[in-house]
Amino acid sequence: KRRSQHVQGIKALKATGGNVAFEFPAQRISVEAERPDGAIDVANVGVVAVVPYIIMKTAAMGRGKAKDAYDIYFIIKHYIGGVRELAKEFEPVKDKNIVIEAKDKLASKFASENHAGPKDVADFMDLEDEESIEMIKRDTYEQVQALMNLI
């Protein structure tokens, strides 16, 4: 049974790593996209900071959804400023138990290109040819290892 609680006036589900989200300011981003009626629209939305997001996605990896591994890979691969800038975001909390636990889980799930993490990423991307699958698995492994080595 999922339990929720009221936090700052919002009913929120409890999630492993969710408490870390309150140690980082929410980020505001601008999203521009085409609506179903064809008009281009812009919205400014608040999103959780990257460190708690990665911690929560890592905690969720045991639920058997390939998207969790893909989301981690995507954030690392596309973080503005690269993996070094992303690693700097972890600096204030790198010694917290929850971060150490997340690193341990990432290390086990992404221990090689043949482990569950890279395989889940390739599966989620629904790639057809073996060469593309192997390239993505290798890139996933290398991206996660690069972050792990810098935290």
Question: Can you say where each PLM-predicted feature lies in the sequence?
Answer:
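Compositionally biased terminal segments of proteins
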Residues: 1-151
